Swiss-Prot record:
Enzymatic reactions: Endohydrolysis of (1->4)-alpha-D-glucosidic linkages in polysaccharides containing three or more (1->4)-alpha-linked D-glucose units
Protein name: Alpha-amylase-related protein
Quaternary structure, from the entry: Monomer.
Organism of provenance: Drosophila dossoui (Fruit fly)
Enzyme class at the top of the EC tree: hydrolase
Pfam families xref list: Alpha-amylase, Alpha-amylase_C
Amino acid sequence: MFKFALALTLCLAGASLSLAQHNPQWWGSRNTIVHLFEWKWSDIAEECETFLAPRGFAGVQVSPVNENIISAGRPWWERYQPISYKLTTRSGNEEEFADMVRRCNDVGIRIYVDVLLNHMSGDFDGVAVGTAGTEAEPSKKSFPGVPYTAQDFHPSCEITDWNNRFQVQECELVGLKDLNQHSDYVRSKLIEFLDHLIELGVAGFRVDAAKHMAAEDLEYIYGSLSNLNIEHGFPHNARPFIFQEVIDHGHETVSRDEYNELGAVTEFRFSEEIGKAFRGNNALKWLQSWGSDWGFLNSEQALTFVDNHDNQRDHGSVLNYKSPKQYKMATAFHLAYPYGISRVMSSFAFDDHDTPPPQDAQENIISPEFDEDGACVNGWICEHRWRQIYAMVGFKNAVRDTELSGWWDNGDNQISFCRGNNGFLAVNNNLYDLSQELNTCLPAGEYCDVISGSLIDGACTGKSVTVNEHGYGYIHIGSDEFDGVLALHVNAKL
């Protein structure tokens, strides 16, 4: 009987931890993460204070924080080739990172770190030098900055069969030296690294290449982590939020379902399908059942996004900033529809897969600069600063915890729906105008369309819609309009 009770206690404790690891630890009604890809820590701190907090963002995913190899030309992917766990990168040093985390937490913005637990750097010709000056010999699996030696890695082999579990989880992903997470020593170094970040005040982690690690090893590592630091405003016994990169198209041996109880999982099918729909390859009317009915994960397990730093560089259905009208429509739908844990992308301009972030002649990352409207101008795209996107972050806050209702469509690519009595969204992806009296579900009054303008000092700088006592309003979205979407909510009532 004692053994059964002990087993039950351990099982319940494990379930409790895994549920806690799905909690992003947001402040108030905030509920959108932005990925400030390759930004410097000092710039993120200022962005938290001056832009993200005032506009209701909930958190920031930051690029990898630990020392990485220096690659010729400084491509973005060098950040994903670690050689030690020292907190020095082109984004800044440990002091600057800690200052950023503190300042962002102070204004209610949580920090989630992209962490590399699967591997160290790939082969390098001779001795490699990292961003903190550490030397390593990746070809010999020698990383004295940790330290790791060859015995801490799986034997070298190549992934040639993605349906072979051994290859996927113990061979080298694109030549990156594959750590043995089943080793007590390797586990201890990874836990030490993550716990240090927790001590500095981070709220959680995006786990890169999670499918290339056995779920039972990750379960042990996650379960061994410290609780979040209460000195940064987290409640007692709060667990780090975990979201794991698992690319699962539904036909491979290693499945997302092995990981979704450990934490949230990046729902790549969401990204692919929303791209198909707003590129016109699937009618928007079918989006009424968007979510788990499409074969996606359950809402509380899914980290959702239109694009990410990887797939925005690939060809195919995924939308990115280079198709701005469709991208803004897709993002508006993403943030308005009640499904998933939402993350928006903030990119830099790229011409090819390897384009580095904006940098000076000495290869130092440069700070974003802004025009009079607050848009970025010097190689940074900053989608999160587009009015049509940050306004939808405010919309999502206004409609939090409300249900989808009042769905309407024209049988094709014009749709609208309500979020309770708090918000209304309409989209026109047809080649003709949407002009229709529609149920907005909102209380009677005049509302500012937060896509075409902003509510400033009681006046709307864009379109406005008058809602009658029955909740109906006249909605017009011309086929030639730049945005193709209209959004109203109770916090934008004139």
